[in-house]
Structure formats: C-alpha cells, structure tokens
Amino acid sequence: MFQGLIWVGLALSLLLALDRIFSSDFDDGNLDIILRMEISYDKIYLSKLLSVWITYCLPIVIIVPLISTVFNLTINETIFITVNLFCGSFGMTATAIAINALLMGLKRMIYLKSIIIIPLYIPFMIFGVEQGSWPVLSALSMIAVVIASFATSYGLRLYGE
C-alpha cells in the first residue's frame, strides 16, 4: 500500500509542475531568446529534465526512506521502493516535459495536459509497485527519455517557427 501512495504522490507532484515547465520562459519571452541563441534542443530538454527532476522528484526520493520508518518497512522494502522511484521518476518527468513542450502555446490548459498525461503515467506506476521490476522500469524510463527528447525538440521547433 505504501508503494502505491508514494507513486500517486510523485504523479501529483509532477502534475503540479506540469503548467510551469515552459510557461514562465514562454510568458516572459526567455524561450524566444534561448531559441535564437542556437542552443541545441537536446540541451534545452536535458536542462529542463534535470531541473524538474531535482526540484520535484528528488525530494520525494530522499523523503521515502524517512517515511518508511513510520510504516514499519524493512530495509529491503525501503531500498526496493527507493530504487524503483529513482528509476521511474526520470521517465515520468520526461513524459511531462514532452507533453508540455507539445502543448506549449495553449494558455492555462492544465486540465487538458493532465488528461493526456495520466494514462502515460500508468505503466510507470504499475511496474513501480511490483517488487523486482526495476530493470523493466529502467528500460521504460530510458525509452521515455529518448522519445521525449524527440517530442520536445519537435515542440520547440514548432514554437520557434
């Protein structure tokens, strides 16, 4: 039960971040400046991926071992949850960035973005609560990071034109 609560908490924290990933840069014109500086779209994507992951996912990954003592989990269960959360959170963050880049021009459409992204989070959550599924979760995250890189580049290219 604890694993499910943690994964739902991670999904909700990323849904809160969903409207802020590119919107502040988009609203104040910094995204135009960044795109005119001829910085690679992949560098923009990787910087957003790391900044969103450090801001929204890393605190949850750090807090999980502390909270697991409240639920009387063993060391093995705590390590399992932390490793799965670490592996899956990159894929969930990459998915959020890709959806936000593709729907960047839409103002205040957090509900539409949420409806699109929640079904994409379900495989991460299913494999995240299963014990011993970290290799599958890691592969799923790597695939999501690669596909999201292309989707984010496409979304930024559409905006730049």
Regions found by a protein language model. Name each.
Residues 1, 65-86, 132-136:
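Membrane-interfacial helix-loop-helix connectors in multipass membrane proteins
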Residues 2-19:
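Long, hydrophobic alpha-helical segments
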Residues 24-51:
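Helix-loop-helix units of permease transmembrane domains in multi-pass membrane transporters
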Residues 46-71, 91:
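Hydrophobic alpha-helical transmembrane segments that constitute the membrane-spanning cores
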